[in-house]
Amino acid sequence: MSRYTGPSWKRSRRLGISLSGTGKELARRNYAPGQHGPNSRGRLSEYGQQLHEKQKLRWMYGLNERQFRTLFIRAGKIREGQHGINFMILLERRLDSIVYRLGLATTREQARQLVNHGHITVDGKRVDIPSYEVSVGQTIGLKDKSKNLQQIRDALEATTARPSFVSFDENKMEGTLVRLPERDEMEPEIDESLVVEWYNKLL
């Protein structure tokens, strides 16, 4: 399944949340796009709620359906913890997500582009795979030439706080995943139990 390349604001308005995390998509029109947008969010069925939550989480992290489902299945094989929370932890451990959490990018989409274009290093070695799974203790940095990119400097300047599961050295412009995230440190708008219910019916 190909990745959606249309305007992200349309998806954000349809779901009623900011998928980029900036809030800009909903600043002017906090309702779904289209002629009936202001009145289009009625009460969803149980099926609709589960699908809505699954799509919201998938689009938030920018994965296609195959990638998303594969990661969900992997999370189910982890013996300790809850399936839904383990799934979200795996999403957070993606390299593009850690780059975003460190403040090197203002959105996950921008973080994914930085990884794809070869600007990001893991333990000093260039990694250009956004889905690369970061382990606790690994250091995420920038190639020397990339440290002067204006978009990265702008992102760092705009970053006012970082979650406690990462640390960042402003001078070296690199950060570390110091531990796995807790549930309250991940996306609060998501009800992961609905995502689990959705896939349990399909798998």
UniProtKB/Swiss-Prot annotation:
Please state the gene responsible for encoding this protein.
Answer: rpsD
Q: Function of this protein?
A: One of the primary rRNA binding proteins, it binds directly to 16S rRNA where it nucleates assembly of the body of the 30S subunit. With S5 and S12 plays an important role in translational accuracy.
By what name is this protein known? Small ribosomal subunit protein uS4
- Xref: Pfam families: Ribosomal_S4, S4
Quaternary arrangement and interactors, per the entry?
A: Part of the 30S ribosomal subunit. Contacts protein S5. The interaction surface between S4 and S5 is involved in control of translational fidelity.
Organism's domain of life? Bacteria
S4 RNA-binding domain residues are: 93-155
Give UniProt keywords alphabetically.
Answer: Ribonucleoprotein, Ribosomal protein, RNA-binding, rRNA-binding
InterPro entries reported in the protein's UniProt record: Ribosomal_uS4, Ribosomal_uS4_bac-type, Ribosomal_uS4_CS, Ribosomal_uS4_N, S4_RNA-bd, S4_RNA-bd_sf
Q: What is the lineage of its organism?
A: Bacteria, Bacillati, Bacillota, Bacilli, Lactobacillales
SMART domains in the cross-refs: Ribosomal_S4, S4
- Gene Ontology annotations for the cellular component aspect, listed alphabetically: small ribosomal subunit
Q: Which GO terms describe its biological process?
A: ribosomal small subunit biogenesis; translation
Q: Which GO terms describe its molecular function?
A: rRNA binding; structural constituent of ribosome
Q: For this UniProt entry, which segments traverse the membrane?
A: none
Protein family according to the UniProt entry: Belongs to the universal ribosomal protein uS4 family.
